[in-house]
Each structure stands twice: as structure tokens, then as C-alpha cells.
């Protein structure tokens, strides 16, 4: 019996981890929403009170029950009402990744909302604290807009530390080639970041600050979209133990590069771009084994934006002012076999803008199989390049 238990222990731990569903609820765009809680096909939600052109974030319980959501300016509770002190956060919904929510590793009731201002403006990178024990369990913000660093680009991403407990929050300085990695522990948010000078300068006109930042599912790589006038995607290595970003590689030119996302198995990188001024919307796939680039999709929409991996293993693509999301159905597959569907998911009468919600990447969480309601982990993704 003891041998059987030892043999089954890894499987039991895997299922315990995957019973947690922190990315099942999405709110974004023009009061649009989705739930992934009822199987492999997401269903529209029409109860959102949030309008945001770009950035947004959602907090849930580990079981996927809504706690609150934000566009980086206002925070709404689970009853879709603004929190009492949740009106004046200093991110903006017109920033690519205006908000990101990180749970406090030492508490089930405290959350940090990180915000970045648009186009390298002085508001910079800040964080606000949400305490879910306040307002009769609906939550409120005892402290808001605590400055970390300024100015920054519109890039913001987070990944679980290698210890499986803490979290790295990564942004990019403006007028610099420096990534800044802040560690969030049970003691709070680190006052000083680890800086990594690597890759392209983020500088020039304020619009050059536009573009997303994403971690791979295993947390070992980081990708960025660099908008005008750089017009490219960059890939980096990331050390989850130290927070260091290194080894920059570029793909380009891709005019008005905006969104980035990795395939569930980490072997492909996807990027969205719109052409100068919009109107030439394209989705590119980069094979990280061969470095080959393939045009895998075009959109009838004038502009496309964020790309977000869903818990169902599909990648969803924001289409500006549109009642449908684009969907990459099989993102692990090479070239057009990945099957991009431009009007892939109806939003129940609501409209997408350019953003989709940001989440902390945790390698212990996987994606649900489309054929069976089981999970596959990113932990075994092989290192490439």
C-alpha cells in the first residue's frame, strides 16, 4: 500500500494543483466577459461594468470564483460595484497592460494591483493594496498608488518564483533597455528591483511605449512586442530564481507589433501586428526550434491587439470594437495547422477592444485538454535555443 501511495503521489499532487482555476473568468473591452468554468467552450458573461480600451486584470479564488477586476483606474468588486477607495488608480485603460493582480503569498485576503501609465508618462509603475476582509468581505483598498519606478513602458508581466511561493513582477524602464524585476513575498513588495540591461531601447515618441510583455507557460522565457518605430518582437531568457532577463533575440520588422503569446507547450511564439496606421492585421508564428516565421492569420478587422492563452489551450485574439474574438485553435501545431479563426468566439453582444486580461503565469497550472477535461502541465516544456 505504501508503495502504491508513493507511486500515485505525483499524480495526486498534479491533480491538486490543477483543481485550482485562477484564470477561469475574464473581463475586458466594452463590458465584455467570458467564463471557462463550464467545460472546454468559454461562455460569454454580460455582467461586467468595466470599459477599457486595452489593459485589464481579474482576481478570483483558487477555485475560480470572482473576487474583483480592474482596468488600472477603477476596481469593481464581485457584485460589480466600485470598491469605496477603488476609483483613482494611476494606471489607465489606454495602456497596453495597465493592470496586473498578484496575490500576497502570505495571506489569502491581500492582493496587489500593479499599474503602468500610458506612453512613458510620469505616473510610472505603481501598486495598490486590496484587503478582502474590508467592506463586509467585498474588499477595499487601504493604500493606493505606491510608486515603484518612473517612467516605464506599457509592459507588465508576472511569473511565479522558482520556490513556488513568491512572484516576480516585471516591467520595462522608459528611455532605457532595462527590465525591472520586483519580488513579491509574504513581507510585501520589494522596494528595489533587480535590473537587467538587455535587448532594445524603449525610447522615442511616447507611442513607442506601446506593446505587450508575456512569459512562457514554464516561466523560462519572456517575449515583448515593440511598437513604432522599433517594429519587432523580442525573445529573452528568464531566471525564475534570480529575476534576471538575458539573451535577447529579435524578429522583425513587423510594423505596429502589439500582442505576444506562447503556445501551451512553449515551442511557438505568436505575435500580432497591424501595419503602419492599422489596416494590415497579421498574426505571425515563430517556431522556437528552427527560428522560422510563418504568417498564420489575417483579420478582417482594422486592428487586432492582445493575445491571451486560455485555460482551454486556445489562444484568444482581441479585435478592436468587434463582437467576436479571434481564436488560434491548435497553437502547438506548426504553421497554418494551428488554425486561426478570425470570428472564432462570439461575445454575447458585447465588444472587444484591444486588450485581454493579464494573469500571473504559474508553471504548476496547465491547460485543460480539449478532448478530455484533464490538465497538462507546462513544467516539462523543453528548453529551446
Task: Write out the residue ranges for each language-model feature.
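Bacterial Sec-dependent N-terminal signal peptides
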Residues: 1-23, 256-258, 384-385
Amino acid at each position: 500500500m505504501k508503495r502504491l501511495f508513493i507511486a500515485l503521489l505525483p499524480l495526486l499532487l498534479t491533480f491538486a494543483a490543477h483543481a485550482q482555476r485562477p484564470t477561469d473568468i475574464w473581463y475586458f473591452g466594452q463590458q465584455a466577459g467570458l467564463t471557462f468554468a463550464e467545460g472546454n467552450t468559454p461562455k460569454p458573461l454580460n455582467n461586467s461594468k468595466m470599459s477599457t480600451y486595452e489593459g485589464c486584470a481579474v482576481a478570483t479564488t483558487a477555485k475560480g470564483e470572482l473576487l474583483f477586476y480592474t482596468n488600472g483606474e477603477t476596481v469593481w468588486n464581485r457584485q460589480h460595484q466600485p470598491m469605496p477607495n477603488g476609483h483613482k488608480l494611476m494606471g489607465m485603460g489606454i495602456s497596453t497592460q495597465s493592470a496586473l493582480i498578484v496575490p500576497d503569498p502570505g495571506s489569502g485576503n491581500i492582493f496587489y494591483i500593479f499599474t503602468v501609465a500610458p506612453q512613458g508618462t510620469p505616473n510610472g509603475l505603481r501598486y495598490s493594496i486590496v484587503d478582502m476582509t474590508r467592506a463586509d468581505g467585498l474588499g477595499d483598498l487601504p493604500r493606493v498608488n505606491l510608486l515603484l519606478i518612473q517612467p516605464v513602458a506599457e509592459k507588465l508581466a508576472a511569473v511565479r518564483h522558482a520556490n513556488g511561493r513568491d512572484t516576480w513582477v516585471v516591467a520595462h524602464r522608459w528611455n532605457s533597455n532595462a527590465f525591472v524585476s520586483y519580488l513579491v513575498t509574504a513581507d510585501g513588495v520589494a522596494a528595489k528591483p533587480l535590473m537587467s540591461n538587455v535587448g532594445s531601447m524603449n525610447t522615442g515618441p511616447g507611442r513607442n511605449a506601446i506593446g505587450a510583455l508575456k512569459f512562457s507557460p514554464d516561466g523560462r522565457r519572456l517575449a515583448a512586442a515593440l511598437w513604432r518605430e522599433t517594429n519587432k518582437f523580442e525573445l529573452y531568457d528568464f531566471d525564475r530564481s534570480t529575476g534576471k532577463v538575458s539573451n535577447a533575440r529579435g524578429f522583425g520588422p513587423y510594423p505596429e507589433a502589439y500582442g505576444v503569446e506562447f503556445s501551451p507547450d512553449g515551442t511557438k511564439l505568436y505575435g500580432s501586428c497591424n501595419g503602419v496606421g492599422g489596416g494590415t492585421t497579421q498574426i505571425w508564428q515563430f517556431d522556437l526550434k528552427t527560428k522560422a516565421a510563418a504568417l498564420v492569420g489575417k483579420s478582417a478587422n482594422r486592428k487586432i491587439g492582445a493575445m491571451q492563452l486560455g485555460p482551454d489551450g486556445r489562444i484568444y485574439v482581441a479585435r478592436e470594437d468587434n463582437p467576436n474574438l479571434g481564436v488560434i485553435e491548435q497553437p502547438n501545431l506548426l504553421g497554418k495547422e494551428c488554425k486561426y479563426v478570425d470570428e472564432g468566439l462570439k461575445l454575447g453582444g458585447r465588444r472587444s477592444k484591444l486588450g485581454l486580461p493579464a494573469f500571473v503565469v504559474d508553471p504548476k497550472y496547465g491547460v485543460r485538454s480539449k478532448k478530455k477535461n484533464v490538465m497538462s502541465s507546462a513544467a516539462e516544456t523543453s528548453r529551446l535555443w
